[in-house]
Amino acid sequence: MFHGTITKELTSHEEWSHYNENIVEDQKDFVFVKYNGLHLKSMENLQSCISLRVCIFSNNFVTDIQPLQGCKKLIKLDLHGNQIKTLPDRTFWNGLKNLKLLYLHDNGFAKLKNICVLSGCVNLVGLTMFDCPVSLKKGYRHVLVNSIWPLKALDHHVISDEEIIQNWHLPERFKTFSQSLFFNICPAPIKGTTYEDEIKNIKHIISRINEILAHNSPVLIIQRWIRGFIVRKHLSPYFTRKRHHDRMIRVLETKLICIGRNNEDKFLEDIFLIKPESNIKGKVAHWKQMRYSPDDFKYSTEYRKHISCLSYELKTKDIAGNSKQPRHHIQKGQNEMKSDSEDEEVDTKFRISAMKIPLCPSRSLKYRAMLKEIKWDYFPEYLQPLPATRQKPQVKRETHEELKERRNFLASQRAGMDLHLFNDIDKYYSEQRQQEEEARKFAATAAAQVAQERARLNTSENLRKKISMARKLMQKDNETIQKGLRHIWKERLNYLEKVRERKSMFLAEKKLNAADQSLVLSLNNERSILLRGIIQVDKLKRDLSEMKAKHFDVIEKREKRKYKQNLLTEMKKLRAEEIHKRHCEERFVIDTLIFQKGCERLEEAKAKVEFINTYYTSKSHKKYHNKTMLNHI
């Protein structure tokens, strides 16, 4: 719109009134305005921008910001690089309740009293006023920090607790102008930024300020500790409540097998119910999961009497490999189960799908290496029991051809001889053979029962010896562990003493370094102030020289322009005179030509008259001829 300016003639004209009303209606919806470096002198065009949130009006010639009073939704206001010397009153700043970032550096503020009106901004987080005359005053930062309460960052440093709390001396990390509190609150502007980019930049700046305060403000750190303590104290009944560790019981259908482990007179058992008849290769049975608490272990001893125990090292066979039957001990309560399964054939191709044994406690892991060396397991290996009943003798059946031959022999020889005597002899020998077989089997079963009893006694004795040996090993291990712990504690105490000595030396060096650093910082600050003044003086000199050069250039241009105008006027005069001369010469030539033609005609007429006078004699004819000649002339 006319490069951002509208003249009074256009605004007052009747044809432009409707256009101006549309402009005002559009300005009410403006959210983001950026006039950077346009050499503008007033902000009157922003009076109707009610919805304005981000206003960048930097590097101009603005002196009054009162037109922004209607922009009550401002979040960011950038007015640096202008010629503002006074700020509006407190009512102006009370209306800007959403203002969080205010950039006023590089302006002409000179009085602290005028700046204190910024305390009306209830949500102001960041403020910049460096490169202003007021920033060179002694109590500039102290007055601003303690008058604008919500302020968190001033110029290039976040506000420390040392500036707020009087006579509080803090370490170097938390002091004013420390390196940890440095933050570039006004980054370099980027061309082509949109409203979304500016909002993201505002959020980033505020979050960065809060992060620096959270890590470098002792008050906030202590508050965080106290809040954590209160929350933990409030939630401690929920964390200290004892929970029973659930155990998993996996259930399949028919037979009970217990996998148990003895660890310092404590039994932890996982109970499985399996199908011994299942002949499945490489398939996992369907388990039903049940939970039980440690209170259920009270009945484990009674329940253990009625189930069979397996070894800890049950090895399942591979899918295509040979299977090994686990060795287990059959107790008295299993006679009924044993009698039911006597006549069934044992299938050697079954696979037990077992759950993993729960992890051993940390104390039992100490004996793992020793147990590997002596190749001893926690659980005994029991012998495979022999069946209590004898097996049926195998009956040899005759083939069809043998039966046919015997029938033919009996049919042919029956009529010739009596076979009753031979039948009695065969019956006697068969009964005698059967009695011998039964006596041999009875002796074998008696020997097997004796061997089984001897094996049971041997296993119980081996178990007792292994338990006593394990207890002795545990006592020795406890003694060695206690010695090792004492040695470790001594080493730790020596290490802590060395660390304390190093810490004291480090703190002393740190104090010296802090003093040196503070001296260097003070010198750098003084040097930076001096350099800034020198740069400003050089800048003023440069500006004056540039202004003088521009002034001389303007004067030269004016003289050249006047000289050109004089030349043009003289050239016009000369050209007019030349044109007049040419016109006169042409007029003279034309007049001479006309006169010559008239003379020629007169002489021709005279010649004709003489001719007539000489050749025509009659007077009438002469008169008529004279009239015609005169008319012709």
Curated annotation (Swiss-Prot):
The protein's UniProt keywords, in alphabetical order, are: Coiled coil, Leucine-rich repeat, Repeat
Mapped LRR repeat ranges: 51-72, 73-94, 98-119
**Which region ranges are annotated with the description Disordered?**
322-343
Q: Which residues form the IQ domain?
A: 215-244
Give yes or no: UniProt keyword Coiled coil.
Answer: yes
Residue ranges occupied by any LRRCT domain in the UniProt entry: 132-179
Q: Which residues form a coiled coil?
A: 556-616
Q: Which SMART domains does the record associate with it?
A: LRR_TYP
What is the recorded name of this protein?
Leucine-rich repeat and IQ domain-containing protein 3
Per the UniProt record, the lineage of the source organism begins with:
Eukaryota, Metazoa, Chordata, Craniata, Vertebrata
